[in-house]
């Protein structure tokens, strides 16, 4: 075996030369000729593997190392994966978008914008997959490229078509970040791994949940950015990352037959973040039929390679990387493993048959898969694409040397530099400028409409389309087609007749069908087609050995997007008759529909708005949305229909507050609230007309999504992507689903003072001072109504009240205090105070309010920024607000506090520690994991600096827990082994290292270090 460390395979920071940027993902092309890497620098780079594996090629000046740099993403690229056909490259980024890349055969090459790197190959974005609301962390292609699945930090799993890349299904079954995805090689399941401590297996037939696997992840940490799972090539084993066996980090093996997870790979010192099965099966060591080879990458910076049946790994690489492993990828031969790390380097592990045994043939692999009883009906179009010369699999590395100042024509005359497996060059396609003809028309409103038309230099239009997708027509061969049995015909017919997408669609060039072939068959009858096929078979039986081969020579050219099936081998004439009858009906309906669309389009140059009935269509044909059929009236000027009722400072009778304490909001003729790209609008009228409630799409010219009416005027509204809520004057709150169905009608104790929402949580504060909170998705109340009057003191003291992303309320007061509600203790908790801004040494006086985006990521910091802004204004006398505004009538300024000189030091230490403790508590309640860990470490450092032994011991005991604690036997214990996804004992280890630095705490720390070490052992 050998280990290769190509230092030139790297992503360099543009602003800091020589410094390497993190490489998040690595993927080897199915023909092993190319290596794609994805980096923190927002770029994808494609490298020639020949220069990596072959020292002679690496040292050859004529060999190209970097083939292309792809730079269309606007954020860090977190994952790259090649399609199994080899044609497409898919990438996912933290810009929330996944891109599908395709090699442009007519591309000019050159360099990326803003980069000096020269591209030998020209890769262009083929499709843009937009649908996630946060980082796209992982993606996977189905084995036959029928589907592609993307997962992200928005907790969603989105399944796309692998042929036309339309969105097929959104799976919203996880409750945490989804960080890994893999398809079953048999095509039956899709597995996803999430921070909600589950791996879920979904059926590809209906995308329903088959099994949720939880046992290996009950105590797994959430610190890992990836949880990349892998499926064995024979489909029998699912390998899951970031699993735990007690306190030990493991990779869990899940058996397909029973979904049991009692087998582990043990040995890594930190979480396993990526798993990868070799695509081959090998001769078994343990006397079994075969064995599999698997690689693991961990946060402990090491890579291990295992063979099933052996108790020990065959390779453990500990010193290859300086930082954690991010991704793994096997080449098609099953012996070469590529790994990347966050230190910005790539390593290649080339194994020998002596180390891991001999690989078995593809026939043996198919036999092993067949044992599961799953009939693998492959997507014909997707499977066939892999055999076409339109991708890169059949021409793995056709490279041309480029010279400065050399024209495209001159470069075309330079002989290509072939690499093993390349195909002969073909006549270059006309440049894009030659193929594009534009028709520009001016609409009635003065806008330009550009209608591009592809035309060829010496080709018919249909031929130009075919050449755009392929260098040359693929020869017809039934050997390239998957074997489809006779009993599968009804399913194929159903797919042909019942779908409007090209799941079975043929692209130009499929089965020898290209633009040069005659289209006369499409105008004939099905009987004529069959007769022609049979006659051709009788006249030339050698050339037409099967009905399929005969039919392929007579098939008309079918445009991309037309549903279309492929006849199986051995089909009878009756089956072919039925097939062509159904196909012809679909084909002629498509032509008729296009003619109708063209006729309708010629009537007017104006584009009809969405929601307006199309010509010749009725509401029964296309359905409708309430309020979308008629143009919406202009809102007109905003008027106050009812003045606000000012709140009282408090009416007290017999020690009990009574009456209205907070202001009743005014009733406006127009009330609109825009939140997270959504808008909800209220239009109030006099008593002669009902109130209109509408949800609008501001990105589409305020298109009405749904409309409702109310006999009572509305005062407040709020909306999220899950629901909308409206508060009425009669103390009623109406709740609507995202599509406009009314799912709630709640009568509160009094009218609403504030109505806020976030995610699935709705919060209402009434004028009587009671706060209500509901989880709309779970359809239940979070807690009983709680008073906010004791927080305010005076209604004017309220600065803001919002709902955090996890549903916790955040109340910020003008008196420089911030509170949230602890659902466990059912009480208000002070999480920030201007007192700390004045006296705590941990306070950051430079922070300022930066908006909602920061509050979601770092809520504690954002809250302190608001308090700090108030504090600075008060101290500097600029727009004085805050603590000087008291509810007392005399407005007496606060008395300055003084601390005796001999106690000032203890005073500062005490205030600082109380401040850090409040930060830790706030981060816990607001589910801010990163802030929790940062403040915990800062708290430990401060205790160590001051040498405070009693608080140090309290901190250690809270993290180490009971010495004899066993999760499986003590489920009801009050102590929990994790907090916010962190393992408490791991945190305890870090805290002990900090507390061990001062000598006066050594005697306290050492016994706990020994106890913790024994627990891990």
UniProtKB/Swiss-Prot annotation:
Subcellular localization, as worded in the UniProt entry: Nucleus
Enumerate composition-biased segments (Acidic residues).
Answer: 598-608
UniProt-listed GO biological process terms: chromatin remodeling; DNA-templated transcription; regulation of DNA-templated transcription
SMART domains for this protein: WD40 (SM00320)
Per the annotation, which location comes first and is thus the protein's main one? nucleus
Q: Where is this region: Disordered?
A: 387-438, 591-638, 880-899
Which residue ranges have biased composition labelled Basic and acidic residues?
618-638
What sections of the sequence does the record tag as coiled-coil? none
Annotated keywords: Chromatin regulator, Nucleus, Repeat, Repressor, Transcription, Transcription regulation, WD repeat
Q: Which family does it belong to?
A: Belongs to the WD repeat HIR1 family.
Q: What does this protein do?
A: Required for replication-independent chromatin assembly and for the periodic repression of histone gene transcription during the cell cycle.
- The name under which this protein is listed is Protein HIR1
Lineage of producing organism: Eukaryota, Fungi, Dikarya, Basidiomycota, Ustilaginomycotina
